[in-house]
């Protein structure tokens, strides 16, 4: 367990230990976890350049003003976009590619609490579009920029790391999966998608994390649908943590050497008194793809064994083929 005091102590020294001038993209960052993480990133880093994507210009203006107060040397650029649409994701990525030769950090937290299974204009289940398809598209489109960065290269996708569940291969989009199985299905899609991407980018580290129950509009909507105190994952609803604490925890995930890339110098530096490097999703230390829980630790042995079984069944390849087929259907281009 990485306790909050340890996280805060680590974050306090980012300004002196983390390279100055990091370039980052935060998707889904005009509210909730994304906004809190962007602000914490502005607070701790030196001369950051942070792009952030969302739908509300009003919210973005307030966030930019707050970030500029936190760090006057930073640059904060808002891109208004509906990233549930794959074609729009491509447009956003094209803007970043036109402006930047490299990217150090990609942070993905876009999501929506909808249980009526709406579909997008591109005929993808809205919840799945935000949780899986658009995130994988951002990663694959921006992977060359991440690989071009010197030193630190990391992707963090906020979801349900450690809670991977069975896949329904007849319903990858999760349009008809029972509600109680929906979460585990989508979480597995994300993790297996990251494993595929990582094979072609061993110099980039990939984290799929579970943020805990964070006090955000999305969380409150979910809890309200579940009748304010219904069981989640077989247990009682935990106390909500603040968005500010979540921001601190996620900046730690963005910068800590506990989660190194599989190859290269990336984060193989000294841990400086921190907890040790954790296990990747393949059960090996520091292997580059991490499914981690709220406490910053790797998934349980049972979950890692479950992922082994999925690999044996060829699920990594099946998830990727389905995802690429959807991209081709929508854009004419593979991931």
Give the positions of each predicted feature.
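A glycine-rich helix->loop->beta "capping" turn
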Residues: 71-77, 94-108, 114-119
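Amphipathic alpha-helical dimer-interface segment in Rossmann-like NAD(P)H-dependent oxidoreductases
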Residues: 132-150, 195-199
């Amino acid at each position: 367990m990485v306790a909050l005091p340890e996280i805060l102590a680590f974050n306090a020294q980012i300004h002196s230990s983390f390279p100055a001038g990091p370039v980052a993209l935060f998707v889904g960052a005009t509210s909730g976890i994304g906004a809190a993480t962007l602000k914490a990133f502005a607070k701790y880093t030196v001369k950051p350049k942070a792009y952030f994507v969302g739908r509300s210009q009003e919210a973005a203006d307030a966030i930019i003003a707050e970030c500029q107060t936190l760090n006057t040397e930073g640059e904060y650029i808002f891109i208004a976009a509906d990233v549930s649409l794959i074609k729009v994701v491509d447009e956003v990525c094209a803007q970043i590619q036109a402006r930047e030769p490299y990217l150090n950090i990609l942070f993905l937290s876009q999501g929506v609490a909808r249980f009526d299974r709406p579909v997008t204009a591109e005929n993808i289940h809205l919840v799945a579009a935000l949780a899986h398809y658009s995130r994988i598209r951002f990663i694959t489109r921006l992977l060359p920029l991440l690989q071009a960065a010197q030193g630190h290269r990391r992707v963090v996708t906020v979801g349900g790391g450690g809670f991977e569940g069975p896949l329904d291969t007849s319903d990858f989009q999760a349009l008809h999966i029972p509600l109680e199985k929906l979460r585990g299905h989508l979480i597995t899609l994300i993790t297996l998608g990251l494993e595929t991407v990582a094979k072609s980018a061993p110099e980039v580290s990939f984290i799929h994390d579970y943020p805990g129950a964070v006090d955000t509009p999305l969380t409150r909507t979910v809890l309200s649908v579940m009748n304010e105190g219904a069981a989640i994952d077989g247990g009682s609803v935990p106390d909500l943590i603040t968005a500010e604490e979540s921001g601190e925890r996620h900046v730690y995930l963005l910068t800590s050497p506990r989660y190194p890339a599989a190859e290269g110098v990336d984060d193989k530096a000294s841990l400086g008194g921190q907890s040790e490097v954790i296990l990747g999703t393949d059960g090996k230390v520091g292997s580059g793809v991490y499914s981690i829980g709220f406490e910053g630790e790797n998934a349980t042995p049972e979950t890692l064994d479950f992922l082994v079984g999925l690999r044996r069944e060829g699920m990594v390849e099946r998830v990727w083929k389905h995802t690429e087929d959807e991209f081709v259907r929508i854009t004419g281009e593979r991931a």
